[in-house]
Design a protein with these regions (language model features):
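Terminal and domain-boundary accessory regions
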Residues: 1-188
Length: 188
């Protein structure tokens, strides 16, 4: 069994916040390699600037991940040009909003490229935009395991996969020891 691992870093960051713990990328690689030959591991991340997350990205590369990045799209908060109205550039920069980098195309290209030499894909994402990719990979005979968490995964993506594993069920195997926190969306 040849397996490929693809981690949508943006989606997983928010899924991990929701469950209240963060996974260790090394543990994820070890889990993905159990019972299979892990032929490729990809990690996708949006960046505010080229130096953003540099130590983390370097650590991922050293572990064996292929790291793909794109700049986060930046939107102004006021909709107009503050400098044209005499406001300082500092105020304008304070109102910047960053939104998703959208690495779905990179995920699709990588997974379609490795598909001929792959039997199984572990996809860590919740993006509805990947449902058609999953359908195409399955039509090519690949088995797709989707890993995310309840409430953070699109129904269409979950329905397209062969198997769904809730990230919460993997906590004993994946959790980073020093990164425990309370769930962001706890119900009391």
């Amino acid at each position: 069994m040849r397996r490929v691992l693809a981690v949508d870093g943006h989606s997983m960051f928010y899924a991990q916040q929701k469950v209240g713990w963060f996974f260790e990328p090394r543990n994820l690689l070890e889990l993905a390699a159990e019972g299979a030959e892990l032929s490729s591991a990809f990690w996708y991340a949006g960046l505010k600037d080229p130096s953003d997350q540099r130590p983390f990205r370097d650590a991922l590369t050293n572990l064996g991940y292929t790291v793909r990045t794109r700049p986060l799209r930046e939107l102004g908060g006021s909709g107009g040009s503050d400098s044209a109205r005499g406001h300082s550039d500092q105020r304008q920069s304070d109102q910047r909003q960053y939104v998703r980098a959208n690495l779905d195309v990179e995920i699709a290209i990588d997974l379609l490229t490795v598909a001929p030499r792959t039997d199984q894909v572990w996809l860590l994402s919740g993006s509805r935009d990947l449902d058609r990719l999953v359908e195409v990979l399955r039509a090519q005979g690949l088995q797709i395991t989707l890993i995310s968490t309840e409430g953070m995964v699109a129904r269409e993506l979950r329905n397209a996969a062969d198997r769904f594993i809730d990230l919460a069920s993997l906590r004993p195997r994946l959790e980073k020891g020093e990164a425990q926190q309370q769930p962001v969306f706890s119900r009391t």
